[in-house]
Amino acid sequence: MFDTLFNKVPELSILAEDLGELRHQVYDLRDHYHLKGMYVFQFHYCYDFDFHKVVVYTGTHDNDTLVGWLDSLEKEDYKKVSTYIANYDEVHDYQKIIHYCLDLEAMHVIVPVWDMMGCDTSARFNVPGKIGSPNWEYRLSSFEQFDSYLEDYKNMLEVSGRKGV
């Protein structure tokens, strides 16, 4: 199937959701077709990765927000995370994590809006296994709410060499 797909659309880019415990055949298939995998900071911050093979995420739609996640960390885990972001000057740890992710060598970095705005757990988009409200209902009340954060991220993008990407 992938052979046919890539023969018909050679420039096609596919992202493989390669999270969790997977059989080696999944990784073999991903690598054979040069599919991008996923690096999610909340899961992988203490693991080595080939960042050219992944799309970097601060978190996904199934994770807590960065602020909520940081608040829930055990002391030892928080110390580990702190070692990765110690050299960043941003005021808040969630911003330091975003900057760290932008500095990684991955071509693409995805940062959910609730992470960019430093939202707490109350803004969590989805809790797997939970049905109904408030899952899948996150909304900005206005873009003005988001505008105040743009200058900080513009600077991070510049410093990380991602401006215009």
Question: Can you describe what each PLM-predicted range is?
Answer:
Residues M1-V165:
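Catalytic cores of glycan-processing enzymes that make or break glycosidic bonds
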